[in-house]
Amino acid sequence: PRTTENTVIPEFSLMKDKIVVDEIETPHHFDGYVSCDVGFRDLTVVLFGFYDFMNAQLVITDELVMNGPEMTTDELAKRIKQKEELRLFNTELNMPVAPYLRIMDNDLKLINDLARLHNMYFAATKKDNKEAQINQVRLWVQQGKIKIHERCKHLIYHIENAQWDKNRKGFLHLKDSLTGEIRGGHCDALDALIYLVRNVNEARNPFPEDFNEMKGPNVFKSPTKRKDSKLQELVNTIMNIKK
């Protein structure tokens, strides 16, 4: 696609080969994220991923796309659960883990229904300063801070083709792909990515303190020396006690 002054994420065309990957290695420890842009007439798109703390990258592993009569609360919850169990799998624990955070746009009724009926908790994202939030996504794309698995066809198509409307307040309606396999709509997958970038906690370290220590039945671990308290440090200083 041709990049114009109205292209929402122009950096993607230059970085696509580095961003879109066919294989993803999941870290031993990670914070999982789920982001949802809700549409009933438009598409509902849910993104699944994790923040790779060691490499400082947001990794999108899968997507879920629904709309029309199939878009019921029960069906949405069922499919989200299936994707979470498949994609948010901790190899260290050999089991799926609950996401650190689920977020969606401000559909408070759906948020309440998912929590009440399915024990599935979403936080409502802020949606102000949209252009500033898009600029943040552009920077992350430019810096290679986002990885997307190639199975996320709608997300890739929407990022690549999204165009601003004349007021730069929203996106122009996007035609479906030539084969009809990928729905265009209002680039809802891009909105879900914007929510994700806005809400990811880059500062949180998901690794336990003893992650790099040797473990096993034949490994002896000496007791950890307790750190001196501030009071003890002061006494040691006064008494000129050397450690």
Specify the residue positions occupied by each region the protein language model found.
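Short helix-capping/linker segments at secondary-structure and domain boundaries
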Residues: N199-P208
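Mg2+-dependent endonuclease catalytic cores in nucleic-acid-processing enzymes, primarily RNase H-like
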Residues: L47, M54-G184, A203-R204, E213-K243
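A conserved active-site cap/scaffold subdomain adjacent to cofactor or substrate pockets
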Residues: F30-G49, L58-L64
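Short, well-ordered loop/turn elements at secondary-structure boundaries
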Residues: H28-F30, F40-L43, P96-A98, Q142
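Short, structured patches in soluble enzyme cores that scaffold and shape functional sites
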Residues: R2, S13-L14, F50, D62-L64
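ATPase catalytic-site recognition across NTP-hydrolyzing enzymes
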Residues: P1-V38
